Amino acid sequence: MVCVTDQNNENPSQNRADKLPKSWDPKAVEADLYQGWVDAGYFTADPASEKPGYSIVLPPPNVTGQLHMGHALDHTLMDALARRKRMQGFEVLWLPGMDHAGIATQTKVEEMLKETEGKSRYDYSREEFIEKVWEWKKEYGGKIGEQMRAIGDSVDWSRERFTLDEGLSRAVQTIFKKLYDSGMIYQANRLVNWSPVLETAVSDIEVVYKDVEGELVSIRYGSLNDDEPHVVVATTRVETMLGDVAVAVHPDDERYRHLVGTTLPHPFRDDLTLKVVADDYVDPEFGSGAVKITPAHDPNDYALGLRHHLDMPTIMDKTGRIADTGTQFDGMTREEARVKVREALAEQGRIVKEVRPYVHSVGHSERSGEAIEPRLSLQWWVKVEELAKMSGDAVRAGDTTIHPKSLEPRYFDWVDDMHDWCISRQLWWGHRIPIWYGPDGDVICVGPDEQAPEGYTQDPDVLDTWFSSALWPFSTMGWPDKTPELDKFYPTSVLVTAYDILFFWVARMMMFGTFAAKETPELLGEGTDGRPQVPFTDLFLHGLVRDEHGRKMSKSLGNGIDPMDWVDNYGADALRFTLARGANPGVDLPVGEDSAQSSRNFATKLFNATRFALMNGAVSEGLPERAELTDADRWILDRLEEVRGHVDDYLDNYQFAKANEELYHFAWNEFCDWYLEIAKVQIPREGVTERGRNTQQVLGHVLDALLRLLHPAMPFVTEVLWKALTDGESIVTSSWPTPADTNGGAAVDADAARRIADVEKLVTEIRRFRSDQGVKPSQKVPARLDFAACDLTELEGAVRALVRIEEPAEDFEESASLEIRLSTATITVELDTSGTVDVAAERKRLEKDLATANKELETTGKKLGNEAFLAKAPDAVVEKIRGRQQVAREEVERITKRLEELG
């Protein structure tokens, strides 16, 4: 490594190199860098700024949570967008916050109280318990904020929000009252997912399905005499027959047509009879072709019950125990009743058949683990028809654009066929439903600035967490008040989230956002063509993070990755670049340790390249005249401009993977592997030349722009390197590269690009030939080739240095030669390798390499010949193995040929 100095002046670039440590250690700098950014106010948005506004609201993580890989992907992409827009001259608001997470938080606190005090929530008043939750939130709720800082989130911490903040509570009460007064909120007895342990309704997203081993029991209803009316039905939940009110058959099933319209007695209940009804829902080919109907405890039965106006008796209380059946089974748990009811039916001779084991999928509570009970319950609901239509219209009209467009149909599937939304939860932690009941039966909705009359009592339920989350884009900016934030930053520019919460959160934000804008256009702005304003103009949906084999991360598989482990082991930039480099719109992203190590190596490569450039005089102070530059200089500047243009196009369209892959390839394969190596030749070892000074300027110029292009994905290493290179205040406040920062807007020099491509091919082929001949990489050999014939005279010195060949002596005699086809001619390279190769040692090395290649060929062949593996493995994994097989096959051919040449 050489350092160019002027004899009369100290080299400023050498001084800047001294500011860098000897090696890149992210742990040593990341925390201080981040705090410095925050203290400098770089992330604080100013609504009074004259810059154009750009805003993102962070999908609020649960206050109970810790950062997982899905969060890390979300945050990396949002941060990349925010950092780039700041550099492009926008006033950026990236607004952070947390969700109160009703069920999750209440469950955590109840578990804590049970462990520490041996008490349940019922041992406290409601107010006392809620105070306990606030205490817990204060002590434990900041974990995810610390992790956000660790990965570099450039959020405006001064505007951090919590869904139970006073301002957000006011927004919740306001929209509830507006919806209620518009007739869009109502109370009704309908089927819900019920958690007997939590004693509340839960949303679909809080239900996880597991395969359960049970038994399929066939029950005979009606007469035990085969000559008299009877029907056989099958069930895995025998206990629910206590709530059966009907048996359904297909209208065209001749076996049961004579029974349709009749009734059968209930085996245990005198107050119920079983009506035989005909319905297309029934599959006549499945089982007996008859289905037992329990409308209050099964969603399909409930829908059928509505169609046929059936009674809907509930047979379980809120704890999941049998209740109000008037039978000996009252008071039993579901599991106890399942056994006892089957035994009692068997005593009556009504058990026709039992199938054990019978594996079926059963919904379980994500929080408490027990089987969810579909249960008829009095709840509060949002009527969604009009809201869903506005949400669909907004996307169809282009007010909100979904990226990728291929996910639009999934969005329309939700909003075009949406069912009314159950918004009440039987919890204590959350937004209390603002409905009050008078002593004479009056029901009123009380707004945020109103008081309930004396003697009225408030509804005990709280709202579904997703209700307050649906207001997040505008409630966090001060709605229902008129605020500078809403004027400047609403609607938000983009929502970034995973496609799996398209319905649970995204569609509901669209519903409430358009409704709030329709009701208060003076606060949220007017939409287009009379439509309400939308909460975000772009919606970017990314995929899910999976393990390196494409499998979903789960506790049962033990394949989860803690992103903070990667931050500790490889640095935040490695985590971020791995995720950004793999983030294709709407496509799942497989990651593994190899990915993180590769990204860490890339950060180290950037560090070493910058340090080398600085030690060799690189300066960022403009460019010489283009005519004074070498082919290599013009080529790297032109490539930089091409890459900049592509990266801009990709990022404008949320193509994060393509943008970062292109930057990776340019930085590693073109700038480091080729231009830096050529620059070593262009910068003289001693003294100063015009070409050397020009190269130093080009080195600094390219590095300056490259670091700025990489900054959104890799903020920490680029900050350290950019400051050392430029002596600038911070890369955060630098400008995003334009053509003026790359090749000065010049036309691409196609001849220079052609000659560099020829150099790359020439060097690669000679290196490969040397290796095949057994010549050590460090060993110089004499060689003869005509550089003028292939238009590479200017680059002769670089080529000779890169492939370790020297000018031949007068008595030169070739011992080997190769022909290489370049763009303008075929060049013959003659080499004298005599005396440079130990034939015996070379043969031994080649035989060892051949054994390794054959083993790889065998291993990949076995995998690709395994039909079971091919059926299960993701396409990407199979293609990777095919690639390995092809490389191994080529290696076997190459080594075998070389061994034959050695004789």
Swiss-Prot record:
Compartment annotation: Cytoplasm
Motif 'HIGH' region in this chain: 61-71
The keyword Coiled coil appears for this protein: yes
Keywords linked to the UniProt accession: Aminoacyl-tRNA synthetase, ATP-binding, Coiled coil, Cytoplasm, Ligase, Nucleotide-binding, Protein biosynthesis
Binding site for ATP: 555
Biological process (GO), any one: valyl-tRNA aminoacylation
Oligomeric form and interacting partners: Monomer.
Name of this protein: Valine--tRNA ligase
Origin species: Corynebacterium efficiens (strain DSM 44549 / YS-314 / AJ 12310 / JCM 11189 / NBRC 100395)
Origin organism lineage: Bacteria, Bacillati, Actinomycetota, Actinomycetes, Mycobacteriales
